[in-house]
């Protein structure tokens, strides 16, 4: 009896502990459900581990080649942002800045004279062979990158002069002459909107440096290259397709051959048969001649047997 009562008490105690544990689990579950109702934003809240991962990036050639060295990480400073938005550049145009070797007064006077005499068309000039390399795509040298900004071109208003960032002589020393010794083939006069281009650049009769280059450009412009490397104009019209050898007589140096008839050859021959070449002449039978020769030299089998019988009978009769 005592054992059963002890067992009942132990079961009650275990049930009470289980019930208390279930109540605790229910309260913790509600708290966690309430806390998960408002999720945190991982983008707004950055942890220290993420910051460390951003600071220590992996070595990459295109991102930061010096990130692999520890000394560079210690001395690393935040880079300055030099790039400005295009909206600010468009809203506040910067006045044109001229090269130091060119006085701005002469440029303005030359530009006004050009605009008064027929409009400004040289800024939009682009030769046919320069579709891939226009003046707007050329970048200034390293000394002018931070100082020169061309003003925005206003197509609806009055024409605005866009200055060149540097003289042509800095970009291409011998821009007038191509590598074959010839000159450009498009426009042989420099643009008339500025005066410093003639003074500081070696024009050499060519507006753009690449307008007269390459062998492929000379093929479609009726020009050809000689042995000396220069260009010479091709003959226009149908004369290009004419040669003196076309009018010469092709039968001039040929000698005639007399023709012989087959009947004449047959009459002159001793056999009286028609003459035929050896390739198609009838061949004599070789087997008949061979058999005839062998038969004339040797006896046949019947003759040999008859002769042998005669000889045997003669020997018997003599004995």
UniProtKB/Swiss-Prot annotation:
It is found in: Nucleus; Cytoplasm, Cytosol. Its main location: nucleus. Residues 27-56, 78-88, 185-210, 285-299 have a biased composition (Polar residues). Keywords: Auxin signaling pathway, Cytoplasm, Developmental protein, Nucleus, RNA-mediated gene silencing, Stress response. PANTHER family: PROTEIN SICKLE (PTHR36054:SF2). Involved in miRNAs and siRNAs biogenesis and thus promotes gene silencing. Modulates auxin (IAA) transport-related developmental programs by regulating protein phosphatase 2A (PP2As)-driven auxin efflux carrier PIN proteins recycling and polarity. Required during development. Necessary for abiotic stress (e.g. chilling and salt) tolerance. This is Protein SICKLE.
């Amino acid at each position: 009896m005592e054992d059963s009562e002890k067992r009942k008490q132990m079961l009650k105690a275990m049930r009470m502990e289980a019930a208390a544990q279930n109540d605790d689990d229910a309260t913790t579950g509600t708290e966690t459900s309430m806390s998960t109702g408002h999720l945190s934003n991982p983008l707004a809240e950055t942890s220290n581990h993420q910051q460390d991962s951003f600071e220590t990036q992996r070595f990459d050639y295109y991102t930061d080649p010096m990130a692999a060295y520890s000394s560079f990480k210690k001395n690393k400073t935040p880079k300055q942002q030099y790039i400005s938005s295009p909206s600010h550049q468009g809203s506040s145009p910067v006045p044109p800045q001229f090269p130091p070797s060119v006085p701005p007064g002469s440029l303005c006077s030359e530009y006004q004279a050009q605009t008064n005499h027929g409009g400004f068309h040289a800024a939009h000039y682009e030769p046919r062979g320069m579709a891939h390399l226009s003046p707007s795509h050329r970048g200034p040298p390293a000394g002018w990158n931070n100082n020169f900004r061309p003003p925005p071109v206003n197509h609806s208003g009055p024409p605005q002069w866009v200055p060149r960032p540097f003289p042509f002589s800095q970009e291409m020393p011998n821009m007038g002459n191509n590598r074959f010794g010839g000159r450009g083939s498009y426009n042989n006069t420099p643009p008339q909107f500025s005066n410093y281009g003639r003074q500081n650049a070696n024009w050499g009769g060519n507006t753009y440096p690449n307008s007269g280059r390459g062998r492929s450009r000379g093929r479609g412009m009726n020009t050809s290259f000689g042995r000396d490397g220069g260009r010479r104009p091709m003959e226009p019209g149908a004369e290009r397709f004419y040669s003196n050898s076309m009018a010469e007589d092709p039968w001039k140096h040929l000698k005639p051959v007399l023709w012989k008839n087959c009947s004449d050859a047959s009459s002159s021959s001793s056999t009286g048969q028609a003459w035929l070449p050896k390739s198609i002449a009838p061949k004599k039978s070789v087997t008949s001649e061979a058999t005839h020769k062998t038969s004339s030299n040797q006896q046949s089998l019947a003759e040999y047997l008859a002769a042998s019988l005669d000889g045997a009978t003669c020997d018997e009769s003599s004995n």
